[in-house]
Amino acid sequence: MTKKQQIQEVLNNHPELRGKLYERGFVFTNADVNEKIYPFYGLWQTRKIGAYNLLVSEQQRYYVVENSDKIFVLIGHAYNPFKMQCDENDILHSLAEKEFASDAFWSDINELTGVFTVIILIGERAFIFGDASCMQTTFYNEKGNIVCVSSHANLIGDILNEERDE
């Protein structure tokens, strides 16, 4: 029996533990994901963003701002102590006003602190930024045409049906 099957068996026998699996987690992927079954069990928030699916655990927060051809997503909590910005939507709007990858953009994103991941979609391309201290872990994998970004490496394995190397 694989570790994944062992976990599924425990969660089938103790459904009250399902909300603890990948607590505060997120997944951002263009894969088809059934959020009703393991590992989500219908407990996660889901949202279609461009060609991607965003799944966020019930303990986590996320924010989305659209600006012309760009979509800005912030998962977690961010704060800009230099501009005294603590509202994540305001922070995303401020980033969206800047030309992507300009000096002003880099200045703003480098001023952020907190526990977060920022995802910026421009067309079909996704740009991923983690908080400076990596308090919010961010893992990714590409398998064929499938892109998967997540807070948990094992969650990517679950979605892509990959077994973890020992």
Protein language model features and the residues they cover:
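Cysteine-centered catalytic environments shared across enzyme families
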Residues: 1-166
